[in-house]
């Protein structure tokens, strides 16, 4: 009997720590067979897999993921693969999991609709992982931004009411939606202001887009995002409406908070008088038929670029319309009122110029100044064909879109990707260097230089998933897995040196394997 107890004690001593000290949810599926993982990815469309160097390395993550699994039950699946286990090693190699660096003990990979989606690189917290699994393509939580540590982040109506009841200091509360572009613009300034006024005023944020916050939206008249409300001792006083403000503007306003001043409505351009003809859905066709040469500016009252161009356009109209020998006229259309015309001419940005010769629409170059308007209207000529875009040029750069991004990268051992916008001046400066780098490695089948135009509609989700916040952004991928953000020199020498270092590492590892044999 004593020997039996001794044997049991011995077994207890060698039991893995996680079995004895970590409560792992039965909702976490442990997998070691590649076929089992393949089957699971085929039948589940939202899977987060924890790959660990060993059982011990996985311990703290398993504790956290056990709670996550319960929170996303029915919406997502969590699996665990112990790469230190002999049976699982083959699976980890097949899934291209590299835990060889000394400081790398675990990896979290997300799979969606049966395919690799991304390496999880957001905050490893209950709230962040749950939010990610409930919306894998959604933006990170605001509180994940290290710069937002001084903003009080509110998650529930209960927490909001508690804050109002207990907070003695003045409170500036931003009600926002995660997808809102205006919110994203002001957030960095809001959080910077929060740091500057810390100890004197509380700045807080709350995502009220979910339907459970309808009561709060109704109570505080949230009709758009963001809506920023000012409170003192829990009592709502008024809204802060300077949504284009900087951190300094917010801090200055908080020194003496005042309600918004009633805005004086702007006089419509058509009512100001002037030399430009203002056309509508009803009279546009007749006007264009009666005038042999018409340049039309489609505009919107709120558009800053339109306001900047308006005096130039008016001055040019005054000159042209006062010249008896000139047959050209300038006209304007408010696209927010005359929606039929805006739709007919596919107006999607402001200002947009359209030119009509004898009633027929013709191409018009980019014109913005009084001088250019006059010169061109005195001698309208078809503009030269636009230069081919980077994507249209014959180069060795792979131009990827959301549909083929993952599959293409998985086929290349080393890929440097440039996320860019065609209008971005920094991008234009880098493009020749990046193109030359791609040409230099065009014969190496394991290397690729790729580019993604983030302005294209079909790429916007992809650029958001890859956390692209500025242009250009460079990411290095190893068989489709994001390894690091490239932040070295943006020159041909910088790019080629980085890639050559990667290839030299490949050769050293190959030589070492040969020596081991």
Swiss-Prot record:
GO MF term (any one): protein-disulfide reductase activity
Enzyme Commission code: 5.3.4.1
Source taxon at top rank: Eukaryota
GO cellular component: endoplasmic reticulum; endoplasmic reticulum lumen
Pfam families: Thioredoxin (PF00085)
CDD domains given in the database record: PDI_a_PDIR (cd02997), PDI_b_PDIR_N (cd03067)
Catalytic activity: Catalyzes the rearrangement of -S-S- bonds in proteins
GO biological process, one term: protein folding
Intrachain S-S bonds: 83-92, 180-183, 303-306, 424-427
Compartments, as annotated in UniProt: Endoplasmic reticulum lumen
Chain ranges for the short sequence motif Prevents secretion from ER as given in the UniProt record: 514-517
Domain Thioredoxin: from-to ranges: 132-259, 268-382, 376-504
Entry keywords, A to Z: Disulfide bond, Endoplasmic reticulum, Isomerase, Redox-active center, Repeat, Signal
InterPro entries associated with the record: PDI (IPR051063), PDI_a_PDIR (IPR046374), PDI_b_PDIR_N (IPR041865), Thioredoxin-like_sf (IPR036249), Thioredoxin_CS (IPR017937), Thioredoxin_domain (IPR013766)
PROSITE patterns according to UniProt: THIOREDOXIN_1, THIOREDOXIN_2
EC class of the enzyme, as a word: isomerase
Signal peptide interval: 1-21
Matches recorded under PANTHER family: PROTEIN DISULFIDE-ISOMERASE A5 (PTHR45672:SF2), PROTEIN DISULFIDE-ISOMERASE C17H9.14C-RELATED (PTHR45672)
Family: Belongs to the protein disulfide isomerase family.
Protein name in UniProt: Protein disulfide-isomerase A5
Originating gene: Pdia5
């Amino acid at each position: 009997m004593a020997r039996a107890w001794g044997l049991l004690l011995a077994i207890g001593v060698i039991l893995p720590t996680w079995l004895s000290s970590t409560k792992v949810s039965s909702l976490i599926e442990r997998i070691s067979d590649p076929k089992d993982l393949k089957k699971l990815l085929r039948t589940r469309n939202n899977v987060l897999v924890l790959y660990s160097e060993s059982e011990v390395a996985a311990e703290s993550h398993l504790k956290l993921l056990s709670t996550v699994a319960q929170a996303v039950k029915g919406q997502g699946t969590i699996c665990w693969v112990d790469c230190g286990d002999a049976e699982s090693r083959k699976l980890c190699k097949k899934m291209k999991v590299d835990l060889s660096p000394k400081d790398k003990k675990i990896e979290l990979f997300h799979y969606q609709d049966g395919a690799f989606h991304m390496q999880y690189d957001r905050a490893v917290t209950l709230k962040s992982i749950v939010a990610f699994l409930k919306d894998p393509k959604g933006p990170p939580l605001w509180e994940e931004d290290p710069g937002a540590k001084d903003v009080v982040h509110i998650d529930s109506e209960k927490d909001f009411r508690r804050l109002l009841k207990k907070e003695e200091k003045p409170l500036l509360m931003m009600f926002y939606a995660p997808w809102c572009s205006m919110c994203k613009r002001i957030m960095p300034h809001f959080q910077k202001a929060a740091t500057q006024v810390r100890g004197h005023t509380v700045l807080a944020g709350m995502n009220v887009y979910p339907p459970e916050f309808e009561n709060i939206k109704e109570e505080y008249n949230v009709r758009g995002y963001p809506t920023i409300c000012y409170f003192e001792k829990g009592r709502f006083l008024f809204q802060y409406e300077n949504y284009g403000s900087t951190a300094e503007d917010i801090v200055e306003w908080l020194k003496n908070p005042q309600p918004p001043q009633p805005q004086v409505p702007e006089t419509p351009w058509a009512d100001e008088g002037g030399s430009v003809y203002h056309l509508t859905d009803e009279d546009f066709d007749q006007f264009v038929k009666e005038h042999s040469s018409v340049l039309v500016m489609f505009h919107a009252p709120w558009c800053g670029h339109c306001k900047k161009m308006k005096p130039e356009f008016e001055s040019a109209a005054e000159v042209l319309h006062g010249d008896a020998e000139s047959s050209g006229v300038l006209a304007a259309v408010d696209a927010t009122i005359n929606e039929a015309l805006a739709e007919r001419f596919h107006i999607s940005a402001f200002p947009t110029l359209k030119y009509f010769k004898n009633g027929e629409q013709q191409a018009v170059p980019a014109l913005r100044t009084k001088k250019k308007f006059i010169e061109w209207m005195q001698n309208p000529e078809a503009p030269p064909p636009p230069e081919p875009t980077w994507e249209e040029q014959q180069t060795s750069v792979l131009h990827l879109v959301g549909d083929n991004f993952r599959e293409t990268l998985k086929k290349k051992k080393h890929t440097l990707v440039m996320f860019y916008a065609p209008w971005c001046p920094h991008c234009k400066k880098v493009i020749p260097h990046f193109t030359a780098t791609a040409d230099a490695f065009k014969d190496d089948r394991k290397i690729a230089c790729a580019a993604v135009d983030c302005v294209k509609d079909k790429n916007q989700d992809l650029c958001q998933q890859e956390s692209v916040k500025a242009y250009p952004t460079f990411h290095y991928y190893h068989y489709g897995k994001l390894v690091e953000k490239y932040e070295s020199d943006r020159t041909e020498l910088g790019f080629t040196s980085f890639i050559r270092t990667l290839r030299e590492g490949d050769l050293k590892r190959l030589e070492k394997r040969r020596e081991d044999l």
